[in-house]
Every structure is written in C-alpha cells, then in structure tokens.
C-alpha cells in the first residue's frame, strides 16, 4: 500500500509540473508576439477602446477625473511657490564650488591646509549635505516632471476637444448659401478624386506614391449644362465625455495657475471658475442643444402626422380610370384639433398662402363615403320634366343646377339630331341604322346626299369624283385635301 501511495504522489507531481510548463510556454508565446508584432496589440487596444460607450461615463468618470487633475496641478504649483522657490538658491548651488580640500596650492603650504580644514569642520551645515535639502531637491524634480505631464495632457485634451471631432456632410439639394465658415462650395468633379484624409490612413509607401505620381482624374465625365456645385458642411460634434473632461480640466485654469503666484486664496478663484464654466457650457449650452433636438423631433413628427396625401392610393386610381365616372374628387384633408377650451377646430391647408386656415362651422362637411357616391350615381337618376338619362350623362340631385341644365341641353340636341338622321335616307356603310349615332360630328348628322351637294357647291369642287367619295366615306380621316 505504501508503494502505491508513493506512485500516486509521483503521478500527481508530474501533472503539476506539466501545467507549470504549459503556463510558462504560454507566457513565452505572448511575450514573443508582443515583441514581434506590436501593431497587433495596438489594433486590439483600439478596438477595445472604440467598443466602450464613453458618453455613459461622462458624469461618473470624466468630470471627477478632470477635477482631480485640476486640484493636483493647484497643489503642485502651491508647493512650488511656497516651498521650493524660497530655497531655490540653496538647492541649485554647486557642492564643490568652494571645496578647499581639493586645492593643490593649499596642500603645498601646511599652515594654509590647517586653516582650511579647521574652517570646514566648524561649518556643520551645508545645503548639499543636509537631508532636508536633498528631499527638497528630489521633490523639485518630481514636481517639474508632473507639471510637464499635466501640461501635455491638458494640451492634448484641448486640441482633441477643439479640432478632433468634426464630421463632413455633402449637401446636394441645398440651393441657398448660408453665411457660415463651415459651409463651403465644391465642384462635383471633386467627388471622383481621392480624399486626402483617406490617403493619410494608408501606408507610407502609398502616400509617397500618390504625392510623387500626382492625382489622376479618372472619374466620370460631368455634363457642363448641369449644376456642378454642391455644398459641404464640416460640423463640429464633440462627445459628451470630452465636453465634461474639457470643462473640469480646462486650459484657462491651467494657464492661470502656471503664470501666477499661487496661494491659498487662489483656490477661491479656481472654484469659482470651475463652477461658472460648468454652468455655462454643461447646464446651459449643452441643454440648449438638446432642446433644439427636441423641437426638431417634434416638428418632424407633426409633419408626419399632418402630411397632406391624396385620398386614394395609386392602385385604386388606376382602377377607376376606365370607369364611366372617372376618378374620385381629390379634396384637401381636413385636420381636426382642439382649442384650450375643448372646442373642436377644423383646419385645411392653403397652398397659395402656405398656411392652415380654420374652416367655418357651416362648411365643415366631410365628403361622403364611396358607397354613398355609388348609390347616388347608380342606375338612372330622375331629373325635372320626368326625363331619364343614362349613366355618364347625368348628375345627382346634389350637383349644381348649372350642370344639370347643361346635360338637358345636350340631350335635347342629341335627340333632335337623331330625328334628322331618321328623316334622311342615307347612312354611312359602317353605321347601324337601328340605333342613333354616338358621334356629335356635323359630318355624321347630315345625310350623304345633302353632304355631297354641299361639297360640290363649295370651293373644293375642283377635286375629282374619287377624291370626293373617299373624303365623304371616311369622316375619321385626319388629313384633308385642300386646294393648293
């Protein structure tokens, strides 16, 4: 049993040793990849940073971080002006400037050597030998390095905030040129060229190749008659995280602390400056931008709700084109709103004035439905004098009397023409004698013999008989023979 336990323990130790070797080999591979391909590590870090939603940490991270850096800069400048500056001479004096023990001339004379040694032993305080000044010298170097780091960080944040957040928009439908330094005119041919921003993102060889070779205009040809101008807007859009970091770690406070003698009373000015800047930019200007966004969204939603559309869609419009009644009347949409008192207000859009007008209460009538219109126009409608009219030549009682009288006159004229045709003895070959003619042409209303006599007595009698017969027997022919 003891030998088996020893074997199991040896086996377990071998597994632990194997895991340690694997971990060491994995670390070696990672260090090798880090040293051989640092750009891959940079790419991974950039991807991780871009995936973070920094605007969500604007209040919890950016503002406290900026305030901490400002307070740190204030404390360092306070220590420099009140601790390092009074001892500046003692900290910067050279330790070996008056060391008499290193003089070869004094060593030649014994009495001078004794005097110099006694003088140095009596002076027990030297700036370069004291622990206090050694500590101050170290703090002075540390403060200088920290000030340099904070100034560089503040310069980076300021430049990134003011020049690093721009987006370019190409406006092809803008006609009016506004007075803005960010709005510029460009030619449409510029779209076919490579942008310099894309060139800068390429490799060094591609950049050199482009600048030495020159740009080539390989884009499509633009018609000179067309408008070749478009506007380009370069809009400044900083992130919320960068706005809070810039306000809390502002360059104005850093410049003030750098070029002034800092004391404890300077803290009052710094606190007042931080509060005013945060109140103006964050609580006023940024909220004003958010309010403008709310108004734009509300206006867009109102336009979508009140958008004037046709009362029928395209499919139903196509279906009703072949019917006898034609398409339905397109009446403007009536918008119903309510006043502050609860009264119902109906408005209609006026295209000439480009504004909504309130409808009076007497005219607030919505057109009838499709079923009621079909009932009004269906079958044969009865009008005055007990006369009936077929579909397509009548109007419902809702129509105006003017159109009703017009229809009656047309029907009387049609009936009289039918009687004249029945009295005449000649009809065209392609015309049915049992039903009245549908055409209202004068050529169809008169008999063939009367038309021939009238034509022979006119100025066209110089034509031969065949031409006359062809003209009379083909009234639908568009080209007529005239005397030349």
Curated annotation (Swiss-Prot):
| Post-translational modification Phosphoserine, affected residues | 3, 417, 474
What Pfam family is a match, any one? Answer: DUF2418
What are the UniProt keywords, alphabetically?
A: Membrane, Nucleus, Phosphoprotein, Transmembrane, Transmembrane helix
Principal localization reads nucleus
- Location in or out of the cell: Nucleus membrane
One Gene Ontology term from the biological process aspect of the record: regulation of exit from mitosis
Q: Which residues cross the membrane?
A: 145-165, 252-272
| Segments forming a coiled coil | none
Which GO CC terms are listed, alphabetically?
Answer: nuclear membrane
InterPro entries, per database record: Nur1/Mug154 (IPR018819)
Where along the chain is composition biased (Polar residues)? 430-440
Residue numbers spanned by region Disordered: 416-457
- Source organism, top-level taxon: Eukaryota
Q: How does it sit in the membrane?
A: Multi-pass membrane protein
Please give the family membership noted in the entry. Belongs to the NUR1 family.
Q: How does it assemble?
A: Interacts with CSM1.
Q: What functional role does this protein have? A: Member of a perinuclear network that controls recombination at multiple loci to maintain genome stability. Required for rDNA repeat stability.
UniProt-recorded name of the protein: Nuclear rim protein 1
Give the encoding gene's name: NUR1
